[in-house]
C-alpha cells in the first residue's frame, strides 16, 4: 500500500487521458494516470470507426461540423504518423429514408467550408439507391500507432506514473484536495482530478463523497444513454481497398479503412448498436451473464466480456451489399465491441458536442465527455497551468 501526492490525477488512459497527462507533464507537473484495464487504448479510442472527423457526419448540426473541421488540420500536423489518408473518402446520400438529400448535403458542406466534390454515384452504388455521391477529405487514424507514440513520450517523462488494472473504490473530496483510494489500498491525492473515462464517466462521478458534507453529496450525472456497439473488421476486394464509403443520413452504413491495418471497418446506424440503456449508469441484461465481470456500477470491457453479443454481420453486410456494386466486395474478419455514451439532448439533431464539466474549483474535479478524437484539444483551456 502506498500514498502518493501529485499535481494532477487523470482517470482513464484513452486518448483524452494520455493527451492530458502528457500535456500536464510537459508543464512540469507530476501526474498519476489511473486506468482500470491492463493497458491503455483498450476501449473506445481503439474500438470505433477511427474517423478523423472533418464534419461531414453532421449535416443536421453545423456547429459540430465546424468544430470538427477546425481541429482537423491540427490533429493532422500533430499525429500525421498514424493517419491513413491515401484513399478516396466517398459520402453519398440515400435516395430513400434519408434526412438529407444530395443538394442539402452539398449546401451543408459549403456552409461548413469543407471539401465536397460531386462524383458519379454509379461508380460505387447500384442504380436507384443514392441520389448523389461526393468525394471528400476525411481520413482515418491508427489507434495502435497513436498509443505507441503517447507511451513513448510519457516514458521519457520522470514525472508521470501510470497505474493500470486499477479499481477505484472511493473518491473523497477534502478541504483542499481529492483523495482516491484503490482496491489494492493505494491512495492518490491531488487538488486537480480529470475524469476522462468516456462510457464510465457517470460511474466515476457516483464514487465521489464530500468529507465536509458527508455522503449526501451527489454530483450531477451526465444525461446520457448507452449503446453497446459492434464494429466489424473486414477484408476487402482490390476495388474497395483504397476507398471509404459512407451513406447518409439515416439508417444506413459506412465501410472505410481501419487505420493502417489493411482492414476496413463496417458499421451501421441500425445494427451497430446491439442494445441501449437509458439509465444514468449503464444497465444491460447481458450483465447478468457476465459472471460479475460487468455491473452497472463497474463497466467491464465489452470486447473482453464473456457475455458479449453475437455479431450482427449478417444484417450489416446485407445492408451494405444492397447499396454497393458487386465489385466492391468484403468479407468478415472479426468483431470489436465497446460501449458508446450519447447525450440524450443530441438525439434530435445528431450533434456531438464536447462537454467539459467542472464539478468543483478548489480543489478541482473536471469530467470530459466527447465522441470525437480530434476535439481532444478542447481540453487545453482547463489543462493550462495557471
Annotate the PLM regions:
Residues 134-205, 376-384:
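Helical element adjacent to the flavin cofactor pocket in flavoenzyme catalytic cores
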Residues 25-47:
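Glycine-rich FAD pyrophosphate-binding loop
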Residues 83-93, 119-162, 179-180, 361-370:
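Helix-loop-beta segment of a Rossmann-like dinucleotide-binding subdomain
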Residues 306-307, 311-386:
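C-terminal catalytic lobe of FAD-dependent flavoproteins
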Residues 259-263, 271-339:
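Flavin-binding catalytic cores
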Residues 6-32:
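N-terminal Rossmann-like FAD-binding beta1-loop-alpha1 element of flavoenzymes
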Amino acid at each position: 500500500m502506498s500514498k502518493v501526492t501529485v499535481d494532477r490525477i487523470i482517470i482513464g488512459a484513452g486518448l483524452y487521458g494520455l493527451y492530458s497527462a502528457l500535456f500536464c507533464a510537459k508543464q512540469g507537473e507530476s501526474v498519476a494516470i489511473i486506468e482500470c484495464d491492463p493497458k491503455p487504448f483498450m476501449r473506445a479510442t481503439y474500438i470505433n470507426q477511427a474517423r478523423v472527423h472533418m464534419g461531414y457526419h453532421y449535416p443536421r448540426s453545423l456547429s459540430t461540423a465546424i468544430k470538427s473541421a477546425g481541429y482537423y488540420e491540427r490533429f493532422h500536423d500533430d499525429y500525421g504518423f498514424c493517419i491513413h489518408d491515401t484513399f478516396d473518402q466517398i459520402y453519398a446520400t440515400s435516395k430513400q429514408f434519408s434526412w438529407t438529400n444530395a443538394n442539402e448535403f452539398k449546401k451543408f458542406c459549403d456552409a461548413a467550408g469543407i471539401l465536397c466534390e460531386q462524383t458519379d454515384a454509379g461508380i460505387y452504388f447500384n442504380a436507384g439507391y443514392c441520389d448523389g455521391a461526393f468525394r471528400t477529405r476525411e481520413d482515418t487514424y491508427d489507434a495502435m500507432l497513436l498509443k505507441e507514440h503517447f507511451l513513448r513520450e510519457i516514458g521519457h517523462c520522470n514525472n508521470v506514473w501510470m497505474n493500470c488494472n486499477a479499481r477505484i473504490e472511493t473518491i473523497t473530496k477534502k478541504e483542499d484536495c481529492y483523495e482516491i483510494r484503490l482496491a489494492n489500498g493505494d491512495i492518490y491525492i491531488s487538488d486537480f482530478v480529470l475524469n476522462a473515462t468516456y462510457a464510465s464517466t457517470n460511474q466515476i462521478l457516483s464514487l465521489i463523497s464530500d468529507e465536509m458534507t458527508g455522503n449526501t453529496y451527489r454530483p450531477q450525472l451526465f444525461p446520457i444513454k448507452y449503446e453497446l456497439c459492434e464494429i466489424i473488421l473486414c477484408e476487402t476486394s482490390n476495388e474497395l481497398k483504397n476507398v471509404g464509403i459512407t451513406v447518409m443520413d439515416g439508417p444506413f452504413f459506412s465501410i472505410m479503412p481501419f487505420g493502417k491495418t489493411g482492414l476496413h471497418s463496417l458499421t451501421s446506424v441500425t445494427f451497430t448498436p446491439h442494445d441501449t440503456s437509458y439509465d444514468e449508469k449503464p444497465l444491460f441484461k447481458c450483465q447478468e451473464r457476465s459472471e460479475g465481470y460487468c455491473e452497472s456500477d463497474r463497466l467491464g470491457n465489452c470486447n473482453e466480456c464473456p457475455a458479449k453479443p453475437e455479431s450482427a454481420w449478417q444484417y450489416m453486410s446485407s445492408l451494405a451489399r444492397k447499396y454497393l456494386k458487386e465489385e466492391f466486395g468484403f468479407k468478415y474478419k472479426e468483431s470489436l465491441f465497446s460501449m458508446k455514451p450519447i447525450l440524450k439532448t443530441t438525439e434530435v439533431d445528431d450533434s456531438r458536442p464536447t462537454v467539459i464539466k467542472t464539478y468543483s474549483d478548489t480543489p478541482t474535479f473536471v469530467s470530459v465527455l466527447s465522441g470525437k478524437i480530434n476535439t481532444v484539444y478542447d481540453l487545453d483551456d482547463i489543462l493550462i497551468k495557471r
